[in-house]
Amino acid sequence: MTAPTTSLKGVDLLAEITRLKTERNAVILAHYYQKPEIQDLADFVGDSLDLSRKAAATDADVIAFCGVRFMAETAKILSPDKTVILPDMDAGCSLEDSCPPDQFKAFREANPDHIALTYINCSAAVKALSDIIVTSSSAEAILDQIPADQKIIFGPDRHLGGYLNRKFGRDMLLWPGICIVHQAFSETELLKLKAQYPGAPVAAHPECPPQIVEHSEMVGSTSAILKFAIESEHQVILVATEPHIIHQMEKAAPHKTFIGVPGGDGNCNCNMCPYMALNTLEKLYVALRDLRPQVELAPALMDAARLPLQRMLDMAGHTVGKGDVGRPILKSDELDTGTIEGPQVPGE
């Protein structure tokens, strides 16, 4: 059901957002976890890697980022000359909160022979302390390019790091963070659903705990889950990630049934991200009208955080198991001096 689009004392929100977008030469980027009404008016809807690429390439003057704070910060870092607005600056992330920069810095200093492979769900300050940033859709391709004998710190998501360790036979040191949304999925409720829909595959995000992943037929990023759900021959798909992605599934494959795996005891909305939900059409309208709140970061911080992000963008096109594309990352001392460039991906 589509939410009402008129409020703020009768303002036609869709019409005004469209007008302001043109007037401001703005682009609206939205994550798959946003409410359907925001996804439907966005210029681009995608996962963190998709949206990072769009932010880096846009010729718009203003980026209206409908997501959470670390995503908007990433857009600002990659497009420092753009005005980046976030409808609600309180839209944070439990993973970001779990990894304070001073503690992450101390963790790095205690393990000087390790490079830091860091999940994008972190603050700009933690990115600046990292060697390479990854998203859930690029992590496997990037890890595949790092020599097996290179010691690695991975954070802040311990479940994604554990999944990568198991899949690649690695022994990365893991920061103990979790996503509160994916942590809430219930193994008991998942098994009930599997019994209710025999043969229906489970598509799970690697931020889920191992007991959810082990019952899943497919594990991948939001974009990979979406692709699987649309292309699968199965007519019923069980989805173990934030349920607002189901909106895109239903638009692309309306003849199929997509069922979100419950959290907790099955009677709560604890698998919906409370931070993503803070963004609304009303707040987006006000942000475009006032160009506030803006993401503002110190130039030196953006410069330091941009290097590991650029490595991610350069390395993300590698095909796992097909050999290195360009030079692999070698060791932490070369990364720290900035003498190793990320591989150049053909066609990008």
Feature map (PLM): residue ranges:
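Active-site loop-to-helix "anion-binding N-cap" substructures in soluble metabolic enzymes
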Residues: 1-239, 246, 250-261, 265-348
